């Protein structure tokens, strides 16, 4: 695979994480760049590991991974999105709550895993091609780091416009990503 294809693949794989990061950044009041970078690093690290895991599994269980990855991502994203919506409605009455909390490490890791299962499936496919899997995985991780950090910062501006309802919007974004993953699987 040439460098152009690798870069296109990397940024293509980072789009779900970008959208999820917008959703994560929206409910936070004025997140610092360090918070956005923390999110980007977590998403980037997970997105680097999943194609490597998928590549390793390619020889062992490619049929299972390809048959179930969309369902796993769908369930995780519906759960996380639903949780954000519920928290958004609970917090909607308390308009003076300042500042909004940071997202917990494990919540970010779970979201990153849910949005990177497609990268694991890509890793399975890459096992059957002549590619440098380390370079490809690092490219995917770096693109995801950049796009997730950017997504958090974009989400911050959306959140400042719509206020506390941003958590509901973020939950809807995650659910939308889950539905899109399932739709793409069944409708190509």
From Swiss-Prot:
Any single Pfam family the record assigns to this protein: Mntp
Classification via InterPro entries: Mntp/YtaF, Put_MntP
Keyword Cell membrane recorded: yes
Localization annotation: Cell inner membrane
GO CC aspect terms: plasma membrane
Single annotated GO MF: manganese ion transmembrane transporter activity
Transmembrane segment boundaries: 3-23, 66-86, 106-128, 143-163, 168-188
Keyword list, A-Z: Cell inner membrane, Cell membrane, Ion transport, Manganese, Membrane, Transmembrane, Transmembrane helix, Transport
Thylakoid is among the record's keywords: no
Membrane topology note: Multi-pass membrane protein
Disulphides: none
Job of this protein: Probably functions as a manganese efflux pump.
UniProt family annotation: Belongs to the MntP (TC 9.B.29) family.
Protein name, as recorded: Probable manganese efflux pump MntP
Gene from which this protein is expressed: mntP
């Amino acid at each position: 695979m040439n460098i152009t294809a690798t870069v296109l693949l990397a940024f293509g794989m980072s789009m779900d994480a970008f959208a999820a990061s917008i959703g994560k950044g929206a409910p936070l009041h004025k997140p610092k760049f360090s918070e956005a970078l923390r999110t980007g690093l977590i998403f980037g690290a997970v997105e680097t590991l999943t194609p490597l895991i998928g590549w390793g599994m390619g020889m062992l269980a490619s049929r299972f991974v390809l048959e179930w990855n969309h369902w796993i991502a769908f369930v995780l994203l519906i759960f996380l999105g639903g949780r954000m919506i519920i928290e958004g409605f609970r917090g909607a009455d308390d308009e003076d709550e300042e500042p909004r909390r940071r997202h917990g490490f494990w919540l970010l890791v779970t979201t990153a895993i849910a949005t990177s299962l497609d990268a694991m499936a890509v890793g399975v496919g890459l096992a059957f091609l002549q590619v440098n899997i380390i370079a490809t995985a690092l490219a995917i991780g770096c693109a995801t780091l950049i796009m997730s950090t950017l997504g958090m910062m974009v989400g911050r501006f959306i959140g400042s416009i719509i206020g506390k309802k941003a958590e509901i919007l973020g939950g809807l974004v995650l659910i939308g990503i889950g539905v899109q993953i399932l739709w793409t699987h069944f409708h190509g």
